[in-house]
Amino acid sequence: MAEEEPSSVSRDLQELQRKLGLLLESFQNNSKVVAFMKSPVGRFLDRHPFLVLTVLMFVTMSAIPVGFFLLIVVLTSLGALMGAILLEGLVISVCGLSLLCILCGLGFVSLALSGITMMSYVVVSCLMSYWFSPSRPPTQQHANIDSQLAMKFTESEKLGL
């Protein structure tokens, strides 16, 4: 049994080598591959197989980390964009409500000041018209003052002043 295993393994390896050779030959006989290998880039790659293998391995191994990085960048950008929109909406809403409260307060203050000013104007104008009206009936106090002034005037006339 031990002798049967190496012969079957060697047969399997030979079969695998034959299949890989056919696959490689089909790639090399492909018209697109032939056209690429005749280009300057293809000739450079044919002259530097180690560099090609290194670049191919680097690109293959870095595809997953670069993909994750780009995914994180896109998700972070979308999150920041949504966050900025939400933050901007929140700031605008808070500022708008603050402005509304301030304007309502200023409206009430201006209404109160207008009312006080109008009441003051009415009271002062009524008092002014009452005090300085020529047709106003004399009050007792004003009558006493007027009579005292008249008496002083008549006394000064009597004395000849």
UniProtKB/Swiss-Prot annotation:
One of its GO terms (cellular component) is lipid droplet. The keyword Membrane applies. One of its GO terms (biological process) is lipid droplet formation. Its main location: endoplasmic reticulum. Keywords: Endoplasmic reticulum, Lipid droplet, Membrane, Transmembrane, Transmembrane helix. It holds the Pfam family Promethin. The chain crosses the membrane at residues 44-61, 68-87, 94-110, 117-133. Residues 1-43, 88-93, 134-161 are cytoplasmic. It is found in: Endoplasmic reticulum membrane; Lipid droplet. Residues 62-67, 111-116 are lumenal. It is a multi-pass membrane protein. InterPro entries: LDAF1 (IPR029709). Belongs to the LDAF1 family. Interacts with BSCL2/seipin to form an oligomeric complex. Plays an important role in the formation of lipid droplets (LD) which are storage organelles at the center of lipid and energy homeostasis. In association with BSCL2/seipin, defines the sites of LD formation in the endoplasmic reticulum. This is Lipid droplet assembly factor 1. It comes from Rattus norvegicus (Rat). The gene is Ldaf1.
